[in-house]
Amino acid sequence: MELSSIEIFKIISALNKEIESDSIYLNNIYQVMNDSYLFKLHQVGKPKKYIMVNPKIGIWASKYDIDKDESIGYVTALRKNLLRAKLIKFEQPPGERICIIHFETKKGLRKIICEFFRGGNIIVIDENNKILSCLKKLKVRHREIFPGSIYKFPPLKATSIENFQKDDLKNINETELEIAKWIGRNYSISKKYIEEILKKIEIEKERKCNTLSDEEIENLETEIIGLIKIMKSDDMSVWIARDGEIIDDISLMNLGISKEKTYHKSESLMSELDNYITLNLSRVQTTNKQKPLKNKIIELEKSIKLQEEAYNNNKNKAIELRNIATELSKANSYIEILKGKNIEIIKYRN
């Protein structure tokens, strides 16, 4: 599961409200659950706050002080640039699956760019957008990410849905483009919201824009404005689809019309992310940590079993040889005694 730009917008709004009028400092950063980072925040006279960042999923507030991995890898670079820094704000570039965390340090302003797409990335830049460190280096046609280079956002593909204007639909019926594609190309909005909006107003996603009636265009406008109101409201409720103990999908609106999944309403987006994703990632971490120990136990059990088998074989052979020796001491001919035995007789010549 990954968060869309719309859910990230809601999360960042909530995070900023949590730090209003407070002097909050970054106490420490931990790498947890392999590819997640836990930011431990401190404010005088108040309980500690935790922010979880998983580049493959998103960002959320957490109440869990979970087990930490060894202090190796990228977390050391984050600490070097950011420890004891004052947290200023969280920011989202319009329509992007990106969160920018602003800090004030003794060396000047620092920003953490958290990119939640294409496997994710975490980048630290200074006030001049110079990259100080990055989780992953990148070199593609439109931008490069490596220490020392200047950070650039990925090319903007569409306008943020929060900037929607009524006039945007004024000339929509002049194009032959399919309505779902038109919305996706013009606005930064995930496919699941497009499909739900069109289902609610009973417009097939393959319909050509130039076949839409004035009433259908008006209904489309109403639904888009409704989604924007949900985004910008203080209501943190969310709709969740689960697969057992794992969150399969998360949405600011009920997608029960367009999806076969069953969605249940929850009162807190942040709590759902923390209670299910954090705990699930923690279980995965615990399982992974136990694997080497389990493998060692399996190897030890195999070794013990082989040693027991070897001991029993040697014991049986010793008993057999003792019996043969007893019989030989009483017999006149060893040939008759050893006949049929799996014993090799070696004769030595003087």
Region annotations inferred by a language model:
Residues M1-N350:
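Extended, highly charged segments
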